[in-house]
Amino acid sequence: MATFNSFRKAVGAIKDSTTVSIAKVNSEFKDLDVAIVKATNHVESAPKERHIRRIFSATSVVQPRADVAYCIHALAKRLSKTRNWVVAIKVLIVIHRTLREGDPTFREELLNYSHRGHILRISNFKDDTSPLAWDCSAWIRTYALFLEERLECYRVLKYDIEAERLPKGSGASSKNVDFNASQTYRTRMLSDEELLEQLPALQQLLYRLIGCQPEGSAYSNYLIQYALALVLKESFKIYCAINDGIINLVDMFFEMSRHDAVKALNIYKRAGQQAENLADFYEYCKGLELARNFQFPTLRQPPPSFLATMEDYIKEAPQSGSVQKKLEYQEKEEEEQEEEEAEHSVQPEEPAEADNQKENSEGDQPLIEEEEEDQEKIEEEDAKPSFLIDTDDLLGLNEINPKAAEIEDRNALALAIYPPGHEAPGPSNILSLIETGGSGWELALVTPQNNNNNNNPRPAPNTKLAGGFDNLLLDSLYEDDSARRQIQLTNAGYGHGGIDTTAAPPNPFQMQQDPFAMSNNIAPPTNVQMAMQQQQQQQMTMMHQSPYNYTHPHDYHQNHHHHQFSAGPSPSNPFGDAFLALPPPPGSAGPQQNNHHHMLL
């Protein structure tokens, strides 16, 4: 195993010397390439300070941005090509130290480059040459995630946490750090919206930092502890910034809306949980060799009673806006209402003319009496339209159109119907109807119904239907129709009694006859009669020719007599079915004869 490690070191030294030689010959940035190769060589030791300082000077603000971009490109190329965990962790250490101690231009260029090339995303990196290399590879991947989150936090905050300097006598140099108001960070002076945006980014950075906990063989490795020391130095300031932000957030918590208060409560809960995890992380790191150079702070947990108070506030918090603004609006409304009531309750008095002249001379305003002002205000309030909207008649059915009313008044067809209690224009129309034999429905249309009975003390029932139509008028029309039908049946021979020669004219509105039916009272034209005779002759010929149409002479005489009797007053329909007039078979002569006699009666 020792031979294998020695062989790997020799191969790594050869690669480094070859790379340095190539950089001196072909590279335009010879000094920078040589410094990068020597700072990230295969030797398992920390990078030398002079090589790191050379990289700092190459990425300073006085250098062109192209030189800074080339340095980042060279480091990214070195990290992507290597499969050795020593070279990988040295590249990350150089990047981390340049972020902490270098010029801000390096952070800006690295942030722009990371969006294009993803320099720190090495989730597939592994070195399985030995168990130590395997454990160190796992920690290197976690370390790269922390550096990537550090860049993301810088993008959100627009400033670097490491650039925020603690006051003298605080920070990592003190043994028991008390996070009070004396240690002011930028998060202590932010608004609630900025806090709700920046505190989650800081908490995510602290989460990645706590994840940088070495395990296995990497716990006692010198290079791992060297990089872990850089992480621990940043943990103090990150937690101080979060703690100041939480204090500022708590001060504004009871003025937030419910949506913002829920976010603030989640941040507050996560801060308490991360304080416990960070305390455990410090306890774990105290067993390392680097613990002799660090004095870990004492972290204080937030009281649980205050957490319950915040949860109770969320249940009663407003949906939007702040409570303070809402209270201010309510106070303003109450003051305005009180002023209006005072103006209406106090009766105005006529001021003296001397006082009015004195005031007007001082303010250069015309004379205006208070009574006139109050009267004008009252008139303006009365003149304001009411905002109540009647939603009962949305279609405007109850509104009266003046044009429609005028047309109804001029309508000559509506003169026959009058409401009860209204006198007709004249009796000429009624007398003419009576003289011409009008009855029933004609008189009911023009004669007003008198429902007042002097003998009956009870009030007459309301016989009015919807639209002003009289119920008695409707009943009289039905009675008249039934009487006319009875008279028609009696005249046709279906009822008892004789024929009424003084029958009233039929109601034209109740006619149920077919307008295209043939009349029995009017003789048809000559051509129709000739067609009917030809049809009757054809029927008789068919009756004689049929072998099954044998009838007795008496039956034939009766049938022939019945045919002549029925054909006399009412000729048959020439468009009807000719086979309906055929005589029945011999077996059914008796019933058919009885039916004929019944029809004659």
From Swiss-Prot:
> Known SUPFAM superfamilies for this protein?
ENTH/VHS domain (SSF48464), GAT-like domain (SSF89009)
Query: What residue intervals traverse the membrane?
Result: none
| PROSITE patterns, sorted | ENTH
The UniProt entry, under InterPro entries, shows: ANTH_dom, ANTH_dom_sf, ANTH_N_plant, AP180-like, ENTH, ENTH_VHS
Pfam families in UniProt = ANTH (PF07651)
Q: Which UniProt keywords apply?
A: Coated pit, Cytoplasmic vesicle, Endocytosis, Golgi apparatus, Membrane
Q: Where is it found, in Gene Ontology cellular component terms?
A: clathrin-coated pit; clathrin-coated vesicle; cytosol; Golgi apparatus
Compartments reported by the entry: Membrane, Clathrin-coated pit; Golgi apparatus; Cytoplasmic vesicle, Clathrin-coated vesicle
Please report the stretch or stretches of sequence annotated as the ENTH domain.
24-161
Map out region (Disordered) in residue numbers: 319-390, 548-601
Mention one GO molecular function.
clathrin binding
Compositional bias (Acidic residues): 331-342, 367-382
Per its UniProt record, what Gene3D superfamilies does this chain match? 1.25.40.90, ANTH domain
From the UniProt record, give one GO term of the biological process aspect.
clathrin-dependent endocytosis
Q: Does the keyword field hold Membrane?
A: yes
Recorded hits in PANTHER family, A to Z, give: CLATHRIN ASSEMBLY PROTEIN, ENTH DOMAIN-CONTAINING PROTEIN
What protein is this chain from?
Putative clathrin assembly protein At4g25940
